[in-house]
Amino acid sequence: EISRPGYYEVMLADYGVKAQLTTTQRVGIHKYTYPTNSENQRIILDMIHGIYNYDGKVLWTNIRVENDTLVTGYRITNGWARTNYTYFAMSFSKPITHYGCEEKAKVNYRGGYAKFNMKENFPDIGGRKIVAYFDFDPKMSDELEVKVALSGVSTEGALKNLRAEASGADFDQLAAKAS
């Protein structure tokens, strides 16, 4: 484990994955190095858990797959603010090959959406207790970079933050600036 201002690194021993993190003011940058012979590279987006978890904290979550390298969305929580919206935009350094989700809460009614398989490759994911996953082709590279921008205003604000603070730069360049 390595930790210094603007940089954190840890080996995820259970998976053999090296995780490196750095940041700008509004963007978190992740770099994952998978074992050379990995058959799968997966990122989990857990929209349920956070600091100070309790049942009823998450009011709603939405995840939208915009294209094969961009995911946007938001989470509405109840707590220190009645309806606090946190918007995000995530970009990936290589294309998503497959994605899906699991709804951890009971869904009583899905209306017209019932005719769709909303658990796999459905581009608009919504629910109270959502955990999504994104798979990537390990043959392209052992490394995957993920940039996650936040905004308290809108998804468009998160996209603007992503473009303004992390566009055109890779993990190493952004880590050097953060130090």
Show which residues each predicted segment covers.
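Beta-sandwich/jelly-roll carbohydrate-recognition scaffolds of carbohydrate-active enzymes
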Residues: 1-179
